[in-house]
């Protein structure tokens, strides 16, 4: 078991390739800031065909500026639902499938609701109750 930490790394300035790793990773955990995970997932999906991915979905970086409120907070549940449905549809275009989807048990730094998505290349026909996941969001204290 080996863990490589990429905190403080600007993924926009880095080209990620399977050749960079020996052995090739089979798992990635993503918690990125100030960037949509849509900019990172295609590289992971292409370069690491057997990789499982757990990604933190942050609606404030996925919804688009027009749907993000004051101070970068997304409060509208409809926007959360749109973001999650859109993300579920998007990952399929990359050959990835959502195997688990849930609300994060902690809020983002500024109080944003965030969600955890477990992705694999293994096909599944799971359907997630996105509306319920959003509406029943609770934070553990």
Q: Which residues does each PLM region occupy?
A:
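Short, glycine-/aromatic-enriched active-site segment of Class I SAM-dependent methyltransferases
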Residues: 59-76
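Class I S-adenosyl-L-methionine
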Residues: 87-122
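A short acidic, Gly/Pro-enriched loop at the edge of an enzyme's catalytic core
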Residues: 17-27
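Single conserved hydrophobic/aromatic residue that forms the stacking wall/gate
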Residues: 1-6, 10-11
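Conserved SAM/SAH-binding loop
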Residues: 12-16, 34
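A short glycine-rich, Lys/Arg-flanked "PGG" loop and its adjoining helix->strand segment in the class I
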Residues: 38-54
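Flexible, glycine-/basic-rich loop-and-beta segments that form/coincide
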Residues: 113, 118-141
